[in-house]
Amino acid sequence: PDNFQKGMRLTVMPVYRPAASSILRSFRASGKRHLLLTGGRGSGKTTLLRALMPSLCPDAPMLLTAAVPGRWVEMRDTAAGAAAVIGRFDAALPPGENRMRPVPDGFAAVGLPALQRMAAASGWAVLDELGYLESGCADFQQSVLDMLKVCRVLAVVRKQDTPFLRALCADPDAFVYDLDCPVPPLGCIVMASGLGRRFGGNKLMADLNGRPLAA
């Protein structure tokens, strides 16, 4: 910028993104069955999913969605080679992200048969992505939730507040990784009774930011 003094340099700090291998280790250590990736637009959800697949589920069937901005959203079943429109742009809808109107027939033609085959196989299933359009097809939503009981799921989940997406991420067997918050809040736990003297006495009365650890 023009108002920068001569000799000053602008330093841009990169956004921290754990490697796919690190996320995979955390997921496996959790003991959960499903790995759900969420985050804002452009946060790298699909890129991360593709990086995880070779180690996690290289041959899993995939149900993909792709948007043509201002026109439609298409769902594609990679195993069957089938595709259908599941959302169409509607200029009458309020401005914002959700200007696609759900097309239930598209879910019925491609989405539901794909989920049924995935459930029957009882292996890994890959879904990219699940979002607000699914709210227009109750059968598809229920099929995804039912599939969690018989399959292992690797999925990209759009970061929106809908009953379906909340139920999906709240599943007790789901490990949810949020790319907008890659590092959990840090805390400090002091394991001390206060009675031992190996590291000095009155440990719980030690000062931290002007206050004792234990009041």
Task: List where the protein language model places each region.
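N-terminal pre-Walker A segment at the start of P-loop NTPase domains
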Residues: 12-23
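Hydrophobic anchor at the beta1->P-loop junction of P-loop NTPases
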Residues: 37
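The conserved Walker
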Residues: 41
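Conserved lysine of the Walker
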Residues: 45
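Hydrophobic positions on the alpha1 helix immediately C-terminal to the Walker A/P-loop
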Residues: 48, 52
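N-terminal phosphate/diphosphate-binding loop that engages ATP/GTP or pyrophosphate donors
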Residues: 54-98
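N-terminal glycine-rich phosphate-binding loop and ensuing alpha1 helix
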Residues: 187-215
